[in-house]
């Protein structure tokens, strides 16, 4: 039975970043359900926007994005829509439009060969015994059993590691549903849509490489029905759909209290969305995935006496920032407050009157 210093479950942005940073310094094994190349197998449903905090992380690491990861076009504003109030506003944003699956595969490709990576693999069972973490996984057509001193859960919203460590922990979840359509809009755009009759979270759209992606986060019970209902409403705002080319769905976490951020215990650690590190106001998680990976790298290499305590303390600033996003989310999803903010015109950039496409409701007050 092979033994490692660190076993990482999941190679999204968090797991890939950590594996890359620990390579050559610790003996690392990493398991991921995505394939190494191509579009077959699992891909993460995501709007695919790289926030400024994530961009800063790449600056610190001296990394630049390859052209095949960057999507077309690059959009400089978010069109915010309040459906019930028939209001539309434009707010400046500095996101980079990316192909999320290509981005994930690129992140994996940066992991040095010294890390033992198993692609298209499935983690079957984990447990702790004799001060070691035991992992049984299936890869290359057969089951393998390894042990590790430290276990890292970077396995997202449905984290197996989080469920093992905190079997009674409950965090609010939504089903994220996305559909892809051939782009019909004369001018591409990115939008954020609020409609409390549909969801107490939010919906979105993004133009990407000739496609129009429309999605949102909805209650688990009847998400598909609500998604369809919102699509019908958006015709009043000049959204154009047609026949869906592709449909995607996944679970997304929605932290709503301080206790929703869990860091791990017993030499097991959680990073990225597995730890609840995702913005409640935008559902953006890549920047927090990268930040938590860097924090854990620093803790593991310093090897303090109590690693879990050290990691919890080191993530306090990150958790406080995310708690602020919970407060912001409550403001954005409160109909009266949101309507007042949007009507105030604060930070709104109006489009020129002779602009050919405005994507507003006929009753919208600009």
Swiss-Prot record:
GO molecular function, one term: FAD binding
Pfam families linked: FAD_binding_3
Organism placement in taxonomy: Bacteria, Pseudomonadati, Pseudomonadota, Gammaproteobacteria, Enterobacterales
NCBIfam families found in the cross-reference section: PRK11445.1
Species whose genome carries this gene: Escherichia coli O6:K15:H31 (strain 536 / UPEC)
Designated name of the protein: Protein CbrA
InterPro entries, per the entry: FAD-bd, FAD/NAD-bd_sf, Geranylgeranyl_reductase
Family to which the UniProt record says this protein belongs: Belongs to the CbrA family.
